[in-house]
């Protein structure tokens, strides 16, 4: 058992992820975490005060920390709400039952983007409103391209969407590390819990919406949580995610999914937005969901595609199945990342261990 594939990849005949919510004993995995909501359709009507308190309690619990900590603000709803709650509790030490003054009197917040990116603008609005010491991490396209190999090495994946979003996060972690911050709170998980992705507008009924939120949650360790965890851990920083706290999930995932439906013109994550109305500025509270890799600057994705077009020929892509018989790439960008991955992790087991679910297909199914 190892925390990273790179330490055992060349020694093992078979590789597999240690599944979340399991323990390992006598040569087999046993699932200890089996919540009712994973197999049943909840029927509890949402209570906005209870939802608000559940998330506040989750953030408060995650602030138990004896090292300097900060918050990540992407400029979207999720991270902004987490940051605002953290700011509320940051003046006292959680370890003392909020009786003692905090060792670090000011909460630091961090955002990253290309010059002029929408995320930087929105994050600054939130930081000013909640009173954090805010740090904008601006990067260039070339800096991002130069970091791709390191990102793939640390994340141990060739998933295109994950690499796109992880690269700016990796660069931001380097800046955070240089300031002595050891732990950060991040906003991953809210989209999965509340049906926050735009395709959830297509959910035909509450049952299908709930099934999809459960599926997304169960895949988080391979995608968003992998990105947040390993991008930060590469620089010795711990990322904590209050939206995925066990106690919070017990409440939020037992909400009747009818209350999460994007019906009657309601925005996605409507109940979350309503629960925290007044905590952050309305222009961010009601801001529409963007992919992290889009929000950091729209030129970022175009530049990644253009870079791959230069590196990978049409013939390369046409013969991808021959070179990569296990989960062959279907785009030049995917081909480029797969080449880098295979240089670092050349065994078939390494390639096979990276499960790549077609999100497009899941959207079509929904």
Please report, for each region that a protein language model flagged, where it lies by residue.
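Adenosyl-5′-phosphate
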Residues: 178-185, 204, 209-358, 362
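Cysteine-centered catalytic environments shared across enzyme families
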Residues: 1-158, 283
């Amino acid at each position: 058992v190892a925390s990273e594939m790179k330490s055992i990849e060349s020694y093992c005949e078979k590789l597999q992820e240690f599944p979340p919510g399991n323990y390992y004993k006598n040569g087999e995995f046993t699932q200890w975490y089996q919540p009712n909501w994973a197999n049943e359709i909840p029927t509890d009507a949402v209570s906005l005060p209870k939802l608000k308190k559940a998330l506040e309690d989750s953030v408060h619990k995650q602030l138990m920390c004896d090292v300097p900590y900060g918050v990540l603000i992407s400029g979207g709803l999720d991270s902004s709400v987490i940051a605002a709650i953290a700011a509320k509790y940051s003046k006292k030490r959680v370890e003392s039952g909020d009786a003692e003054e905090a060792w670090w009197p000011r909460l630091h917040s961090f955002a990253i983007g290309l010059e002029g990116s929408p995320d930087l603008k929105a994050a600054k609005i939130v930081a000013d409103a909640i009173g954090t010491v805010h740090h904008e991490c601006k990067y260039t396209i070339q800096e991002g391209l130069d970091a791709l190999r390191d990102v793939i090495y640390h994340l141990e994946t060739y998933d295109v969407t994950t690499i796109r979003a992880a690269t700016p996060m990796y660069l931001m972690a380097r800046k955070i590390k240089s300031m002595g911050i050891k732990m950060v709170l991040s906003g991953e998980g809210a989209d999965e819990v509340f049906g926050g992705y735009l395709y959830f507008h297509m959910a035909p009924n509450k049952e299908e919406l709930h099934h999809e939120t459960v599926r997304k949650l169960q895949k988080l360790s391979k995608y968003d949580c992998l990105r947040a965890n390993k991008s930060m851990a590469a620089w010795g920083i711990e990322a904590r995610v209050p939206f995925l706290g066990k106690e919070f999930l017990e409440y939020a995932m037992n909400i009747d999914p009818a209350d999460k439906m994007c019906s009657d013109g309601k925005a996605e994550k409507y109940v979350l937005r309503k629960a925290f109305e007044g905590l952050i500025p309305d222009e961010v509270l009601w801001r529409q969901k963007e992919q992290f890799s889009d929000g950091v600057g729209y030129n970022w994705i175009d530049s990644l595609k253009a870079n791959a077009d230069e590196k990978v020929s049409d013939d390369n892509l046409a013969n991808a199945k021959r070179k990569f018989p296990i989960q062959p790439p279907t785009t030049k960008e995917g081909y480029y990342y797969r080449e880098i991955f295979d240089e670092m992790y050349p065994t078939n087991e390494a390639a096979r261990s990276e499960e790549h679910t077609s999100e497009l297909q899941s959207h079509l199914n929904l």
